[in-house]
Amino acid sequence: MDILWHVIYFLATSKFLTLFIAFLALPVVIGLSVWKGRLAKYYAVIPVLAFLNLFFGTDVAAYAMHSFGEKGSATITGSYDTSTVYNNHNVVGYHVLLKTADGKVVETSFEDDDFNIYPPKNSVVYPGIGDHFTVYYLRWFPKDFVIVDNDDSPWATGLRCGRLRNDVQEANAKYEFDRGNAGYRSDYIALINKLLSEKCVDDNDEVDAFRHDIENIEAGQP
């Protein structure tokens, strides 16, 4: 089964190569369709799938890897330049050390146009050098993997807490602008409580300051 997912992963992360091969094979497909007319609709699916792979291939690969892969851990050890440009962006590659479930360490890499993040999303944030994160990989092809950004790994936790802090800052700005707005007050309090419950604040003084803010808001004090 790993071989099938390996092929799917390769095709999904080689979108333009897949499309190029499909169009090269188009004359063959047309010829087969003429020769075997009753099977034409099946042959026609090939270029259609290659086109759809441009938009949904990485999502399918991410879900497949997470569903059928094994859980491991990884860290980024360095980056490198590539000669690829994607959407006016110079693609950057990253060197990775991946530790499998049985403790084996594998050297691998990925590029930031692979979109190998689970759950899939339109805009992705990748770990930096030295970050530790969770991956799902194929047992027989451990160099095929996706990065998990919504679990409790150190990197994913930092990412989640960073987003929460941004939300708290935005809610605070709204509340400070219009303190009489009940919606702004409740949103600000809810986000502070979420920030604290997610254990995103380590400093006891900062925790006390947030709780003091909540008490003041609920008491109607400035």
What are the roles of these predicted feature ranges?
Residues 33-42:
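Membrane-interface helix-boundary motifs at transmembrane edges
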Residues 43-47:
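Hydrophobic core segments of alpha-helical transmembrane domains in multi-pass membrane proteins
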Residues 2-28, 48-222:
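Oxidizing extracytosolic/periplasmic lumen-facing domains
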